[in-house]
Amino acid sequence: MLERCIFLTRQLWKLSEVMQKIIEKISNKSHIWLALAGIVFLSPFIYGLYHEWLACIAAVALCAILLLRLRHNGQLRIQVGVSFAAVFVLVAAYGFSAFWATDSGMALMGFVKFLPVMLFSVVLMQLDTDELGGLLRVVPASGFVMTVLSFGFSRIPLVREAFVVDSRLAGFFQYPNTYAIFLLLGIIVLAQVECRLFLQLIGIAVLLLGILMSGSRTVFILLCATVPILFFATKKKSTRVVLAALAAAGVFGVALYAYLTQNTSGMARFMTTSLETSTLIVRFLYFKDALPIILRCPLGMGYMGYYFEQGSFKTGLYSVAHIHNELLQLLLDIGWIPALLVSFAILRTLFSKNTSRLQKLLLAMLCAHCMLDFDLHFLSMFFILLLTLNWSGGKTFVIKSKSITVTAAAIFSCISIYIGTANLMYISGHPEMAAMLYPPYTSAQIYLLTQTTTAQQMNRRADIILQTNQHVALAYSAKARSAYAAGNFENMIKYKERAIELTRYALEEYIDYINMLQVGIELYTEAGDSVSAEFCRARLLEVPNMIEAVLADTDPIAWRVADKPQLTLPQKYAELINSMQ
């Protein structure tokens, strides 16, 4: 017992010495470095800055940092090279896409969402190369604290759902896959930087446990690829031993857990890793459906355009806001040129001699995961990607004009506060306030449409939506219902068939259409209008053909996933159609 106490005392003493050195190092850092370190450390805890209103807060904070830098130094430095050009074009493209986007209102929200990416890049340019590398050390510290807190909160029933998704630890991201890749990046940093063995052992162990508890199969595969790379890339023998021992213990622990509990969910989800898993197969369906759209739209469809248009071109039963591939997402959102520029900047970094091995490995793993997920929509992950890029080369511009900088910061801040407030109102359950503040806010308008009680209100709200977005099936369905209430079956048919075009796998739309056509046939027959009654009957008889056309267009992959198309009409409707023939 005495020996244990002595051992613990020594370890605590060593830890205190380490903490003292860390404090000394931090005290020597510049204010701008400390501000960026705080953003890199804290932003993952704020939902990873996923929501637009959080991105707006980040934009205002970064504008404030730049203004303070200008005040203290009298100038701002901008290195206009490949990396900055890619970031600038990316953000600008989100803004300009409003002129041709599927939804012009939501396109502006995309600009505000990714504005912090450009501002963060400008702040990075105010640091030296050595200071940039030091920011990466913040990543494992943030992941360590997040894992400890997430595990603790997951044991509290009151808040468990906020940290656990389908028995998988999701961290403060509330998304297990992004949480897992964040921890893997932390492991890579810990294995590559100089630090005490004790801290390295504890840090990697906790981060590895977090990955296992996340149940992310993709990150597990990347982890299996990363460990051998780190093992041979690391010169320190002690680090190699730590990596090998912890990796072996992790795999053995998961296998033992699965064997003893006969449970392959949650932590043991890795045991079901296969190319035939439904979640992986359906992603290939997303990609396959999107490729023709990418070729057809070289300028992209704007922010959220893919989400609103997918109902008209998808060949399976799914509905996703993101395509789960960041390269394809860029192509869909803002087109070929920005996507190619970003890709070139990444490839240039990976093959540059001026890029450290740590940066290359972090960038490679993050990009590999981005090919199967939407990590960069969490801006905290985008910030890490920016830290790994090569910012050298190009021409350096020095901005000394306070009026230009203050004006730009004020414009960006005002736009961010305006859009961010509207988004916050919507997220917090006040869509009427969101729509009042920002009328082109389609998501808020759609919710308000579902709450309308009269045909007139329904028609008016649908018209507001269709002014900025011609691809909302619910709006056309509402106009069809309004026309039906007014007895205008010609318009009802036009709008309902457009709604079906935009949501081809929604069986309820076909059933609703049949019900309205049946009433039309009865009313026209009673009124003695045989021509109109026959027209309605012809459209009703066409419904099975419409369904058959959709089924014929359905990709074989769609039948291999969990959510299969369900387009079989109930028996009474099938009998009704047969009786009309």
Which residue ranges define each predicted feature?
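Transmembrane signal-anchor hairpin modules in multi-pass inner-membrane enzymes, especially those
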Residues: M1-F96, T102-P140, V193-L199, P228-L243, ...
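Alpha-helical transmembrane segments of multi-pass inner-membrane proteins
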Residues: W33-I46, I57-L66, V91-A98, M109-V123, ...
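Short aromatic-rich membrane-water interface segments that cap or initiate transmembrane helices
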Residues: G48, A101-S104, D166-T178, L275, ...
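Flexible juxtamembrane loops connecting transmembrane helices in multi-pass membrane enzymes
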Residues: R168-F172, T226-V227, V254-F287, I427-H430
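Extended, hydrophobic alpha-helical segments in both membrane/secreted and soluble proteins
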Residues: S216, Y306, E326-L327
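TM-adjacent membrane-interface loops and short helices in multi-pass inner/ER membrane proteins
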Residues: V282-V320, I334-L340
